[in-house]
């Protein structure tokens, strides 16, 4: 996908490049399906048909019914829509339980709900970054209306067993809503929706453009669901506003494309991840932050010497692009690493490398070579 062989893009957890075939679908849709899907005349009817086809394609990758799939503008909107809408369906309590390593688009809506009188309990992860399921379940009782947990952490790649969590939550309180942020999981790990009520995904993490996402909303909730904003009757009245048909078609194309290669990509990603881990063993200062059960697409480590922004700038001079934390937390220390109990030096020197199917061993080797030079050169300057 990259046109420049000298450029090594290793920040795919932040965003991915739009696949050429996806861009082609969007370009064609903009020219051929320009009519409003809600219009009653011929071009509008054809747009509606294309929208329904795209919805069905995305729904198939999640294993849900088409009518349970709602298009949004991004994963953050999906999270907000799910959380703020779902709590309005429950009046029997005020309890909310959430993991301590959630994305800001989950954290901040829940902080706002806490100001409104909801009892929000934040459960820290274990020191290795994995979900402390037992502690989360300890807080689920008859007054718990919502439990939220991401499926794959965006900073360290932790894979959480949300299917088991959802089953255990429902066993304790069948009326508790379970929300899952699957933005980093979709098209990387299998998703089973059993016992999950709402689930969010995003296009720009799977080689679709920014500006398109989706929300799975179970039929169990839809009748009582009250969205936080109002308008037209698009998306069954739950997400008002004229649908972005070209991007919805692009999302469907991207998801369909990646669904065919999940197993082969997983094998390739594991090889790249292992190559990077082996290469980092040459640096005694380096501490791996990603746990063993992390998805292979993400490897987070601390080099415990040079501040992240300095090392990132050094790497960027050679057109090697990685990150220090979540792009959505720009300029802020990693709350995930802090929740894991990492010390300030480890947090300040953390680097996240994240792969996609277009990356190669040469990308890893280029990173390691430049990183080695940086460790030598930048430490001399610091001294």
Specify the residue positions occupied by each region the protein language model found.
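Pyridoxal 5′-phosphate
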Residues: 1-383
């Amino acid at each position: 996908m990259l046109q420049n062989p000298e450029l090594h893009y290793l920040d795919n957890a932040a965003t991915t490049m739009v696949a050429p075939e996806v861009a082609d679908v969007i370009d064609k849709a903009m020219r051929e399906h320009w009519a409003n899907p809600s219009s009653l005349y011929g071009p509008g009817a054809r747009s509606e048909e294309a929208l329904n086809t795209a919805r069905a394609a995305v729904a198939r990758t999640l294993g849900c019914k088409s009518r349970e799939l709602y298009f949004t503008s991004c994963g953050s909107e999906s999270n907000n829509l799910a959380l703020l809408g779902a709590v309005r369906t429950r009046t029997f309590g005020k309890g909310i339980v959430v993991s301590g390593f959630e994305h800001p688009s989950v954290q901040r809506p829940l902080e706002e709900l806490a100001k409104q009188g909801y009892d929000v309990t934040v459960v820290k992860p274990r020191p290795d970054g994995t979900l402390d399921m037992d502690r989360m379940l300890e807080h689920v009782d008859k007054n718990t209306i919502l439990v939220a947990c991401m499926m794959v952490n965006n900073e360290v790649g932790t894979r959480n067993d949300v299917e088991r969590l959802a089953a255990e939550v429902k066993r304790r309180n069948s009326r508790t809503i379970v929300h899952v942020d699957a933005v980093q999981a979709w098209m990387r790990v299998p998703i089973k929706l059993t016992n999950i009520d709402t689930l969010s995904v995003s296009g720009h993490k799977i080689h679709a453009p920014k500006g398109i996402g989706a929300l799975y909303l179970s039929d169990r909730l839809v009748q009582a669901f009250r969205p936080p904003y109002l308008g037209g009757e698009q998306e069954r009245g739950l997400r008002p506003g004229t649908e972005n048909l070209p991007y919805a078609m692009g999302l469907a194309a991207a998801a369909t494309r990646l669904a065919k290669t999940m197993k082969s990509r997983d094998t390739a990603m594991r090889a790249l991840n292992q190559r990077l881990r082996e290469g980092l063993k040459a640096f005694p200062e380096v501490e791996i932050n990603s746990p063993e059960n992390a998805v292979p697409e993400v490897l987070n480590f601390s080099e415990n010497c040079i501040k992240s922004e300095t090392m990132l700038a050094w790497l960027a001079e050679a057109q090697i692009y990685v990150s220090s934390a979540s792009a959505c937390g720009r300029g802020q220390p990693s709350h995930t690493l802090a929740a894991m109990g990492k010390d300030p030096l480890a947090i300040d020197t953390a680097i996240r490398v994240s792969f996609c199917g277009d990356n190669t061993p040469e990308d890893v080797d280029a990173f390691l070579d430049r990183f080695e030079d940086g460790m030598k050169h930048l430490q001399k300057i610091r001294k």
